[in-house]
Amino acid sequence: MVTASAGLTEGIISPGTTILDKGQFEEVANGPKCWIYPSSHGSINVSEALRDSCNYFFYKVGYDLSMVNGTYNEDHGVEMINKYSSMYGLDSKTGIEIAESKPKQTTEFPITSAIGQSNNSFTTVQLSRYVTAVANSGTVYNYTLLK
């Protein structure tokens, strides 16, 4: 959902944009594969990609977010993904009054980071806050325990 938000906001995609899932993403060497490979989802838009969990769609958006003047730039892609994950509170602790690890945003591979698979690390409560922000139109709340 972070990548979908980034792609939509940055104008990389629109709600009607379709991307052809070719199974394996070949814009980079040793490109990752969609979970459905050797099959594919075919031509798919962002709503369908979220519904079907189409890795290829989000690899392409992550790749496009990484482009600077027509050239793939991994550092720029990481910055873009982290910019949008921060908007969902994935750059800070939740505020809960128990021991909590500081979240770790990605530092590499924006293509696989676009589906949440990289060197990032989040606790379950941090992911809960992220999903809550998605569910309530983007408001990120600090968590607290009630007695």
Regions found by a protein language model. Give the residues of each.
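Beta-lactam-recognizing serine transpeptidase/beta-lactamase-like catalytic domain environment
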Residues: 2-147
